[in-house]
Amino acid sequence: DSNNELIIRELMPIYEKTGIKERPEIWVVMGLFNIASKVQEIIQNCKKELLIALPQGAENIVDIIQATLRTLSEKGVKIAVLVSDDTSKETILTISRVAEVRVKNNMFGGGVIGDINQVMILLGNGRNEKGNVEPIAIWANHIGLTGFAKEYFSYLWSDASSK
């Protein structure tokens, strides 16, 4: 009899669709190492589509993620990379081996969207608890935020030039 009650107690919220909903996570991430680690995690977990907006001055990241991008490309993941107009021709050539690349002038900030279920938005620099200036970003797996980020990326992409 207690088993029946347990089963009913567990299944009734599902049946009534009133169960406790899981809260999406939204994190403020500070520091280059922490941001790079989370970006690498997003890239490594990507299965279908990876969208990257590479901000001004972030060309050194390309060398770090190049091997992972190649692996994803070989697995059939669609990769699109938006770069700022001051990005070197060598960097654009390197990225274009594994991804479709477009150049956008006046691009501010950057980010990474993996499979429309995770996003990292680079906000610029902020001050940590000690008062030191560090890069700051927002990471989320919130469907609304990831959807908005993809829409915005698509808007920038449509206005960018192919190289």
Predicted regions mapped to residue ranges:
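A short, Trp-centered hydrophobic/proline-enriched beta-strand micro-motif
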Residues: 48-54, 79-81
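PLD/PLD-like phosphodiesterase catalytic module centered on the HKD motif
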Residues: 1-8, 12-17, 32, 58-163
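Glycine-rich phosphate-binding "P-loop"
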Residues: 20-31, 53-56
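A short, well-structured juxtamembrane/interface segment
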Residues: 31-38
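Secondary-structure "cap/kink" motif recognition
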Residues: 40-49
